[in-house]
């Protein structure tokens, strides 16, 4: 059954979520708040799920927002969420991120699965599991697709595990994505950063800024 919720800190922006699909979490929130989009931009949300990051992108009133998602059930809910918020400048595409090729875009948003798949999890292909583990969406193939679909000087907003930072840097460099901004995300229940936010520019000029970290406060 679909449940009506709202974006964290934005009670005026409502969305439906389902127990059968991956729900928004703090990763969604910190990436959504990290975005910076211009009105003339065409935005692609890779792996849009039920459209939460499309709703964050819509706050900037871009020219067009495209949601790419392999799960057709998630897209049904994404469409419902766009209509719920009276968004008309959108397109939803049911396709595989790895093979997807279409119009080049100004901005790509991506909150991908980032846990490496253990051998005992390979047989578990539920949508929730695929949304967390990279069994069907390896980092190298994902970054190739991002670069292929992004205009020169286009911007990527990306979230990934801090423990795999070296892999992200390597794959970005292979695919001409220059990291311009990084922001580490900390949880008050942990002594280390779990995830990191990236803003990268395709064929951009070198020059990296490491921002002040995001601190997620949790009850102990």
Which residues make up each language-model segment?
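SAM-dependent Rossmann-like transferase core, predominantly class I methyltransferases
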Residues: 2-42, 48-59, 196-199, 203, ...
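Conserved Class I SAM-dependent methyltransferase catalytic core
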Residues: 14-16, 20, 136-193
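Residues at secondary-structure transition points
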Residues: 22, 26, 48, 65, ...
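Short, contiguous clusters of charged residues that form electrostatic/catalytic patches at enzyme active sites
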Residues: 26-33, 76, 95, 137-144, ...
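SAM-dependent transferase fold signal centered on methyltransferase-like domains
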Residues: 30, 76, 80-87, 126, ...
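Conserved SAM/SAH cofactor-binding pocket of Class I
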Residues: 33-121
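Mobile active-site "lid"/loop adjacent to the S-adenosyl-L-methionine
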Residues: 112-141
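Class I S-adenosyl-L-methionine
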Residues: 175-219
């Amino acid at each position: 059954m679909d449940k009506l919720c709202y974006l964290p800190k934005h009670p005026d922006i409502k969305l439906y979520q389902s127990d059968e699909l991956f729900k928004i979490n703090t990763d969604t929130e910190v990436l959504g708040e990290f975005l910076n989009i211009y009105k003339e931009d065409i935005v692609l949300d890779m792996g849009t799920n039920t459209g939460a990051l499309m709703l964050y992108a819509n706050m900037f009133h871009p020219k067009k927002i495209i949601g790419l998602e392999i799960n057709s059930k998630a897209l049904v809910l994404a469409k419902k969420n766009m209509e719920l918020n009276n968004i008309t400048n959108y397109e939803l595409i049911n396709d595989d991120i790895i093979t997807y090729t279409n119009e080049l875009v100004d901005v790509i948003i991506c909150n991908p699965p980032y846990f490496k798949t253990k051998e005992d999890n390979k047989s578990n292909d539920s949508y929730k599991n695929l949304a967390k583990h990279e069994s069907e969406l390896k980092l190298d193939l994902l970054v190739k697709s991002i670069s292929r679909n992004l205009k020169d000087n286009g911007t990527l907003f990306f979230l990934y595990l801090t423990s795999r930072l070296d892999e992200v840097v390597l794959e970005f460099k292979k695919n001409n994505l220059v990291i311009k901004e990084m922001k580490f995300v900390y949880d008050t229940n942990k002594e280390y950063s779990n995830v990191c936010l990236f803003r990268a520019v395709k064929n951009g000029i070198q020059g990296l800024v490491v921002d002040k970290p995001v601190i997620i406060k949790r009850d102990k």
